């Protein structure tokens, strides 16, 4: 499918899964659609599963947008509480289109949780409360990482929310990335499990590539395991002359929870920095201009001893302590404070997802998961910016289930192209006019139709129902449609 065909499907208001290989222009198309929506004055929620991906579209993480934070699952009571937060409810109610990028990093349970929050906040039993939902990503990227003692997360396409959205699949097949076409051919060969000895030989030749040593374009070293990353970063830090600045994590609250929180956040318990150190932010702060994954260099320390970080765009940010906390019913159970940085001469392949690097040194000799090689190699724009130290048998393999699902997506995309492209394009602003007219007509007879329920209305509804009033009588009494009355009674668990 071409970008133009996919854009037409998006403009028709369908729920869409947008996918394609590296360089197919997924993010470009999303930005183009976002601009279209803004021109049409359609309120759009711009989100991504990772902070890095969110910055590509000037959005925020879906976790923050939906108010779920670090939650993976939640009880009905907790979901009601999230949906009842005024800020979250208002955001969900005024949004018309929700975009989620980098969805391979979002597991099935979290998508289902977000869907339930949206449904309750918008007071609609339609999937996501009737939002147009646009999911974008590539399941050849690495899946969400499981925390210690937790089961492996289910992939997003196995969620109930995915099944209920009735998604149109838009599989982009054209290559739009500027630069080295050779690396795109290699990535496509790995992606389709059709690579041969010529591909392997070409990657071996990259072992001797000379990468730029200019500090402003410092190349990143990618490893598959954290101990290798830590060792490399400690080695590089030791090479820098000058004094050390040490920052210890401050933990408070329930010790067991604080310890678990320490393992969950990416900031080290003890952070040692020097001027000139390569660092990466490990928390999102959109107001200050950094996200989890933003790279920079320590250019100095301010009068209070906090590190000053120069980003790759030459912007300077003072890295002040950030807070990680666990709450229960607005009560803080544990809280950790630390400078939101870690050393970043080297990072893991998992952490590199969503980044585009000018140059990278990659060690794939210890790959333990299918798809790792594809993710690592797809971080760079060209083979000239790639040095491969080595790779094992696992490095160039892709997940067989993902490969089979990818073939299914291509078939669904072709079906969507034939089905939708022949249809006339509906103008979203015209659709909104139709919706407005419908509401106006409905509210002539039912003045409160589709309005948020108040506590007083709920009390009157319950009293009337328990007094034996019929649905039609309750409808007339409260100025709402019969369907809205039944929906509220179900929500209040008064009827099945």
Please identify what each model-predicted range represents.
Residues 437-459:
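Short, Lys/Arg-enriched anionic-surface-contact patches
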Residues 473-476:
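Short alpha-helical "recognition helix" segments of helix-turn-helix
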């Amino acid at each position: 499918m071409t970008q133009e065909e996919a854009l037409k499907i998006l403009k028709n208001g369908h729920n869409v899964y947008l996918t394609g290989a590296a360089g197919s222009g997924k993010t470009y198309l999303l930005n183009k659609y976002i601009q279209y929506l803004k021109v049409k004055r359609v309120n759009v929620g711009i989100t991504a599963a990772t902070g890095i991906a969110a910055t590509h579209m000037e959005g925020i993480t879906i976790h923050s947008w939906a108010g779920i934070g670090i939650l993976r699952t939640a009880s009905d009571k907790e979901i009601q509480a999230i949906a009842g937060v005024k800020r979250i409810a208002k955001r969900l109610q005024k949004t018309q289109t929700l975009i989620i990028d980098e969805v391979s990093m979002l597991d099935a349970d979290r998508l289902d949780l977000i869907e339930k929050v949206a449904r309750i906040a918008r007071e609609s039993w339609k999937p996501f409360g009737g939002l147009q939902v646009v999911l974008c990503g590539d399941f050849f990227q690495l899946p969400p990482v499981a925390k210690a003692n937790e089961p492996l997360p289910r992939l997003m396409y196995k969620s109930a929310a995915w099944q209920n959205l009735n998604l149109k699949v838009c599989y982009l097949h054209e290559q739009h990335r500027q630069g080295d076409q050779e690396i795109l051919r290699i990535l496509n060969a790995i992606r389709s499990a059709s690579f041969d000895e010529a591909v392997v030989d070409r990657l071996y030749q990259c072992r001797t590539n000379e990468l730029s040593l200019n500090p402003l374009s410092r190349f990143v070293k990618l490893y598959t395991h954290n101990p290798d990353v830590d060792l490399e970063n400690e080695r590089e830090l030791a090479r820098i002359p000058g004094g050390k600045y040490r920052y210890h994590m401050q933990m408070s609250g329930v010790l067991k929870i604080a310890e678990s929180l320490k393992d969950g956040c990416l900031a080290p318990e003890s952070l040692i920095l020097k001027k000139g150190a390569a660092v990466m932010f490990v928390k999102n702060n959109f107001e200050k201009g950094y996200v989890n994954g933003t790279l920079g260099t320590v250019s100095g320390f301010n009068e209070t001893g906090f590190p000053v970080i120069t980003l790759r765009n030459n912007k300077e940010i003072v890295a002040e302590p950030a807070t990680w906390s666990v709450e229960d019913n607005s009560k803080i159970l544990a809280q950790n404070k630390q400078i939101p940085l870690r050393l970043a001469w080297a990072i893991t392949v998992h952490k590199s997802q969503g980044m585009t690097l000018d140059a990278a040194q990659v060690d794939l000799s210890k790959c333990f998961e299918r798809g790792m090689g594809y993710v690592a190699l797809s971080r760079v724009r060209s083979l000239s910016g790639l040095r491969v130290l080595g790779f094992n048998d696992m490095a160039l393999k892709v997940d067989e289930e993902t490969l089979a699902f990818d073939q299914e997506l291509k078939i669904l995309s072709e079906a969507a192209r034939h089905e939708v492209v022949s249809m006339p394009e509906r103008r979203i602003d015209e659709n909104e006019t139709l919706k407005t007219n419908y509401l106006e007509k409905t509210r002539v007879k039912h003045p409160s139709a589709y309005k948020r329920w108040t506590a007083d209305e709920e009390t009157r509804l319950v009293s009337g129902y328990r007094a034996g009033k019929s649905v039609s009588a309750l409808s007339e009494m409260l100025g709402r449609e019969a369907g809205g009355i039944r929906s509220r009674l179900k929500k209040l668990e008064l009827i099945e």
